[in-house]
Structure formats: C-alpha cells, structure tokens
C-alpha cells in the first residue's frame, strides 16, 4: 500500500533513482495505491546529466509493493521493495529498460509497453 509521503525505488533507466508519492490518482479521497495504480510523485534522488532532475513532479505507475497482492486463484505475491516506473501523460514509460520483476496485473491494466520491456513478469 502506497500513500502520500511514501518513498519508492525507480525500476527503470529514466534517470530518477528515488521518488516520493504526493498524490494517488483516482477518486478525490483515495488514500492508498496498489500495483497498477498511477501516482503523482516528486523526484528525491536523480542520476546526474539526465533529463529528469531532483524536485521535478512526475507521474509513475506502481509495479512492486511490499504489501502482498492476493490473486483470484489464491496465490499471494509479495516483493522486497516498493518500486514504480516513470510514465508520461499517455501512460508510456520514459525509460527504455525496466529492472526487476513486475506483476502480471499490469497487462490487464493496459500498461503493455511496460510489460514488454520487463525482464520477468510474475
């Protein structure tokens, strides 16, 4: 579960290293974000000499959470970290590579470009 003020790792090569969630996109009073949800975040740490800079406000989609995800078939998936992928307004990733495993639920939510770049889909 991701809520405002939560720090997340960045799972792509867009230039950002760490994000902080400042808003969960959805209903006006939505508190938590789960895998596949879009958030508004601020960059807390960035790689030098890249297009993204520190304190820049961006959109990101959650790809991994430490909170377990229960599927309809009873399988429970839990990751080691909270991670997100930086996206543009159309939902396309800004980076060209994705690091680490991502959940299969992203394909059902029309993030097919992110799924195709991922090395492992669980």
From Swiss-Prot:
Described by its record, this protein's role is as follows: Binds to 23S rRNA.
Q: What is the lineage of its organism?
A: Eukaryota, Viridiplantae, Streptophyta, Embryophyta, Tracheophyta
Q: What family does the Swiss-Prot or TrEMBL record give for this protein?
A: Belongs to the universal ribosomal protein uL14 family.
Q: Which organism is it from?
A: Gossypium hirsutum (Upland cotton)
Instruction: Could you list this entry's UniProt keywords, alphabetically sorted.
Output: Chloroplast, Plastid, Ribonucleoprotein, Ribosomal protein, RNA-binding, rRNA-binding
Report the locations given in the UniProt record: Plastid, Chloroplast
Q: Which GO cellular component terms are attached?
A: chloroplast; cytosolic large ribosomal subunit
Mind telling me what this protein is named?
Large ribosomal subunit protein uL14c
SMART domains in alphabetical order: Ribosomal_L14 (SM01374)
Quaternary structure note: Part of the 50S ribosomal subunit.
Please tell me where this protein is predominantly located.
plastid
Query: Superkingdom of this entry's organism?
Result: Eukaryota
């Amino acid at each position: 579960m991701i809520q405002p003020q939560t720090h997340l790792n960045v799972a792509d090569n867009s230039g950002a290293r760490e994000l902080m969630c400042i808003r969960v996109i959805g209903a006006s009073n939505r508190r938590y974000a789960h895998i596949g949800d879009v958030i508004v975040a601020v960059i807390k740490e960035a790689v030098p000499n890249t297009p993204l800079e520190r304190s820049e406000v961006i959109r990101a989609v959650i790809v991994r959470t430490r909170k377990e995800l229960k599927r309809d078939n009873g399988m429970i998936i839990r990751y080691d970290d909270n991670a997100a992928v930086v996206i543009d307004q159309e939902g396309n990733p800004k980076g060209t590579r994705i690091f680490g495993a991502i959940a299969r639920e992203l394909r059902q939510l029309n993030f097919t470009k992110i799924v195709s770049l991922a090395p492992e889909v669980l």
